[in-house]
Amino acid sequence: FKQKTAYEIGVRLVGSEMCIRDSSYDEPASFYGRLADGIWISDDYREFAFRIRENAKWHDGTPLTVDDVVFTFRHYKEKGNAGIRTALADLDRVEKIGEREVYFSVKKDSEGTPVLPFAVGTFAIQSRAYWAVNDPTKTTIVPPLGSGPYKVKEFVLGRYVLYERVDDYWGREVPIMKGRHNFQFLKCDYFRDESIMVESIKADVIDVRHESVSKQWMTQYFFPAQEQGLFKRELVYLDRPWGMWWPIIWNLEEEKFQDIRVREALWLVHDYKWANRVLMYDFYEYASSYFYNSPMAHEGLPSDKELELLLPFKDELPERVFTQEWIEPETDGFGQNRERIARALELFAEAGYSIIDGVMTNQETGEPFTIDFIFVSSFNLRKGMPFIEALNRIGIETTARSPEVSNWIYRMQSGKFEGGDALYIPNNTPGLALRNWFSSRSADLPLSQNWMNIRNPVVDFLIDKVMQAREREDFYAATRALDRVLLWNFYWVPDHAMPGYRLVHWDRFGQPDTDIALTQGETWLDTWWWDEAKAERVEVGMQQLRSD
């Protein structure tokens, strides 16, 4: 099997959390107990408790206990990465209050929020006994002790990981887990080259994968086995927030990006429609919201409830937050972008820049305007080249590269970049993740997700309102107001949104008899099963094709 993030597969298969999010259309924000068979939450959300299932156990047969839960969250708060520490910043006490009960409370100076209990419930629980004799701060290649439906059987670094189903998995009969995890073995193969991965699945070396490159999706999977129905090519639409896929983001620690006029000018230079038509086969939609494809996204002008949140900051916000809807800049998609370029040059002039001998120059210092870009992949670098070339045409000097992924992550997390890219896909109940991505608090933490170094009191206020909302209308008012403030500050140059996920696979698998379009997330990994009749059909069909 090959999925976009093999790490995520490992967490899902080997670990266990107290709650699991339901993936069905009609319950987009529901959580069900996995490790927990009971939960209590106070009316003000300042206190909550979980009761752990008494039959839960680790893969070595020892019980999974409340002591493990307490250890996990104390460790996360003290030594977790910046994102985890930000998410749990309001958490105060974590205590064992019974053989099966664990109690949580928030700090006195923090307000209880509806999202915190469920966010806590989705963290993977760690073994206190295992980490008592192993250093959790050290990198290791030894798979840690798990409690999930699978365990690591074998692996070769950089090549594959083989997971084996745990036959006596304690959670098999938990209601939300029934019917899941039907394969005895799951193998995740690693590839360094996308084209080799494409040829591997067409050659039947791997069974299923996500296709992440639009050109390959549109051109590479039309071959005899697909024409005979032995190989499937499916766009699986997800009725959930799509967010923003790989927008250009700016490091606001760089002085030149601190001027909102410069950021808007850079946004105007980007011709998304042209890039989507020419490079991406017109496959994507424009990500016009941080919460694109959801009720959390802004629409029209601010509502009365949004204005209640925004008006106290009228003097601190761009006027257009109140008077205009944020929309994609007008373009014909054929590179005729003169009006937008003219406006971009006006904004650069207002910010103190002019083109001197073909070079965009700071009029006060005489320094050229330059941008050093790093992209997560060679595909993203290729996708970004029309934007970079457009910048070059107005005198902005650029460099661009796609380093090895670990180096890209290090540079983004440590702020060693000027322009970069990021993948942002919110869930249906964002809150702690918003704080990690956009809050002043996270900007001050090393290695947080706030790579842009956004420090905006209005953004902080609106994130708190999202997290504190008790009613749906208040929640949507807060997300929409936040959406407008982020967009009109031009922190990102939006690009595309992904309408679900593109799955290619050999037709050997049974699937639940449900409408797959009505899901909130991917279900193939844990709900499919091996279908002998289908597998035999594929084998016979391939033999026939080879003989023809």
Region locations from a protein language model:
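Gly/Pro-rich hinge or "lid" segments in bacterial periplasmic/extracellular proteins
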Residues: 25-27, 119-185, 192-196, 203, ...
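Aromatic- and charge-enriched surface segment that lines or borders ligand/interaction sites
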Residues: 37-82, 97, 103-105, 191, ...
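Surface-exposed binding/hinge segments that line
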Residues: 51, 85-132, 149-156, 302-314
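Extracellular/periplasmic solute-recognition and catalytic clefts
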Residues: 76, 93-96, 153-164, 189-254, ...
